[in-house]
């Protein structure tokens, strides 16, 4: 937890910024804060909406601008258009240090004491007016009520199920006092205080839960780790748990533009933690970034976790499911994008059973739900298996096999080539590929690892952006189609100077890197590296091909990559070299999942 802070004068503070002296893990840091965007006025919002209508749709900048709208402070209670639901607007909660934050609380008109769903994230407690087609992308109009805010539960649904919904503006957001601290111990501590305050209200049964996806879930993971006594359970849907490894520096490669995109979208009257500038100031892992890692061991409450196979929150979701200490935890890994998945009726009914069990004490058979349910993707919009029940993840019957790469002909096989070879490519403009054709039906579900022997000619560093994609028997690309757009498949990242492994967390199937030191490459040096892949689940039919694609830059193909993937590479003018065969065995380790049952030609996969 951060200690008491003081504003200081630092040499690298830009105009309009302040620096605060803060302590994390016994280390003292100068943390930079930028002056926030106060949010759009009603008039500015209407002008943005008018221009968007004239041009046939809102641009990314216009959509972000509408997200930054903050309604004027106006505490009152009113009857919503839902008729049987009231909203208590701008309810004040005083935190332990005296800071006041505000929440909008929706609740059904009833004399029965009810549980509360808390939503704690910096995106604002108000529904983002004018953003319907963006914030609910992939969700048909009128699926949710006008009271649903960004990436959060819909009061129009949950209040009618006997729950209150409390949308919170955290410290520094909107009209709440203080400065914004993004996804660290201060944010988590404030969430603890709010939960204990709201569950003490006379209309509450003393139990709270949390649900929301993406940035909302990221905040909720951290709050759950503080163990509020009245937090009964959590539905952690699509949230990262390690900001350094999963957002700021994927594989050690900085991605500050996405953080700028997030900051620009928030309505902040005071100051906000300037994470893009902090990334420049502290490029290596330290206690500042460790403060933004969820302490999974402290989460002991029942948890319903979801992970989308095609989204950048994937790693954090599985890390959370695997590492929390709760004996009551469930995972649903699906092929949808996060937003439509969150509002599908069958998924709402599913999580309602979970909430009813642990927030209302209803014995509804929830414990019979399979601990793990996975979609196994095939091609385009089709799945080989949907919601297949499993016991754990990685799957117990997983068999790890190595596909050895051959630079001589661009092939891959289960035997290491005896002869050494190399392939050279320009990281700025070219890629290199290695292809294997399956001789039998094969399911790959779990963690892949790419082990390479690499050399950089003409520079002392190299960034690797590998993908694993699917081709048909004739070599034609077979994408996964998500919301109408093609998606390639499994991916990984690594800056080779960050190749050092974190031996506390790394395993044979998941090479977790420490990022605590930089090891530049020497001329002529061939360096072994292991690239961590995000989890994946896909089926290859006999005759189809698996192709490893390696690039020196992130190649954008999906629509959402425009906002979340814009890495700052460090390849210089060097040429990348992949060595294979002999003593320089390079391979892709794949998690092959055999059938659950097989007799002769009969195969059952579940």
For the regions a protein language model found, what residue spans apply to each?
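Catalytic-loop region of hydrolases
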Residues: 2-123, 409-423, 428-430
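Glycine/threonine-rich phosphate-binding loop and adjacent beta-strand/alpha-helix elements that clamp
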Residues: 8-14, 23-27, 36, 57-73, ...
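Hydrophobic, aliphatic-enriched repeat segments that assemble into extended interaction scaffolds
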Residues: 1-3, 100-107, 113-122, 225, ...
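A generic structural signal for solvent-exposed, polar alpha-helical segments
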Residues: 35, 39, 112, 129, ...
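Active-site-proximal cap/loop segments of hydrolase catalytic domains
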Residues: 72-367, 371-377, 386-387
């Amino acid at each position: 937890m951060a200690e008491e802070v003081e504003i200081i004068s630092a040499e690298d503070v830009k105009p309009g910024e302040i620096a605060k002296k803060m302590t994390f893990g016994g280390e003292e840091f100068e943390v930079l804060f930028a002056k926030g965007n106060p949010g759009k006025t009603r008039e500015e919002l209407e002008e943005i909406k008018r221009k968007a209508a004239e041009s046939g749709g809102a641009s990314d900048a216009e959509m972000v601008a509408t997200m930054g709208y903050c309604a004027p402070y106006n505490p009152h209670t009113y009857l919503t258009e839902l008729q049987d639901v009231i909203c208590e607007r701008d309810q004040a909660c005083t935190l332990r240090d005296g800071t006041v934050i505000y929440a909008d609380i929706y609740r059904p008109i009833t004399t029965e004491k009810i549980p509360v769903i808390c939503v704690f994230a910096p995106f604002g407690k108000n529904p983002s007016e004018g953003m319907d087609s963006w914030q609910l992308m992939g969700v048909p109009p009128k699926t949710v009520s006008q009271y649903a805010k960004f990436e959060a539960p819909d009061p129009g649904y949950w209040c009618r199920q006997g729950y209150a919904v409390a949308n919170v503006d955290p410290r520094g957001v909107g009209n709440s006092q203080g400065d914004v601290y993004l996804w660290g111990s201060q944010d988590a501590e404030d969430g603890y205080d709010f939960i204990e305050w709201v569950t003490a209200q006379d209309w509450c049964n003393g139990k709270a839960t949390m649900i929301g996806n993406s940035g909302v879930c990221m905040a909720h993971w951290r709050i759950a780790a503080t163990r509020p006594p009245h937090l009964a359970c959590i539905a952690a849907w699509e949230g990262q748990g390690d900001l350094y490894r999963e957002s700021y520096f994927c594989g050690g490669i900085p991605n500050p533009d996405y953080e700028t995109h997030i900051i620009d979208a928030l309505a902040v009257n005071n100051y906000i933690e300037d994470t893009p500038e902090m990334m420049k100031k502290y490029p290596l892992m330290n206690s500042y970034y460790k403060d933004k890692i969820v302490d999974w061991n402290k989460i002991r409450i029942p948890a319903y976790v979801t992970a989308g196979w095609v989204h950048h929150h994937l790693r954090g979701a599985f890390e959370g499911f695997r590492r929390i200490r709760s004996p009551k935890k469930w995972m649903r890994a699906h092929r949808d994008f996060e937003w439509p998945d969150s509002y599908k009726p069958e998924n709402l009914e599913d999580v309602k059973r979970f909430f009813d069990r642990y927030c209302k004490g209803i014995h509804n058979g929830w414990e019979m739900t399979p601990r793990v349910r996975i979609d196994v993707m095939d091609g385009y919009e089709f799945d080989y298996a949907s919601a297949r029940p499993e016991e754990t993840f990685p799957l117990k019957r997983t068999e790890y096999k190595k596909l050895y790469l051959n630079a001589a002909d661009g092939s891959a096989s289960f035997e290491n080539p005896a002869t050494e070879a190399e392939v050279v490519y320009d990281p700025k403009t070219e890629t290199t590929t290695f292809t294997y054709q399956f001789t039998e039906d094969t399911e790959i579900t779990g963690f892949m690892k790419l082990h390479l022997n690499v050399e950089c000619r003409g520079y002392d560093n190299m960034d690797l952006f590998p993908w694993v994609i699917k081709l048909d028997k004739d070599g034609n690309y077979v994408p996964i189609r998500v919301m109408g757009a093609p998606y390639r498949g499994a991916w990984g990242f690594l800056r080779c100077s960050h190749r050092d492994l974190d031996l506390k967390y790394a395993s044979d199937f998941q090479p977790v890197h420490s990022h605590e030191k930089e090891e530049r490459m020497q001329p002529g040096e061939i360096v072994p590296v292991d690239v961590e892949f995000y989890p994946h689940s896909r089926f290859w039919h006999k005759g189809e091909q698996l192709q490893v694609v390696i690039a020196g830059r992130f190649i954008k193909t999906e629509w959402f990559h425009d906002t979340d993937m814009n890495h700052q590479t460090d390849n210089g003018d060097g040429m990348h070299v992949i060595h294979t065969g002999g003593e320089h065995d390079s391979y892709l380790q794949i998690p092959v999942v055999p059938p659950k049952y097989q007799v002769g030609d009969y195969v059952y996969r579940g």
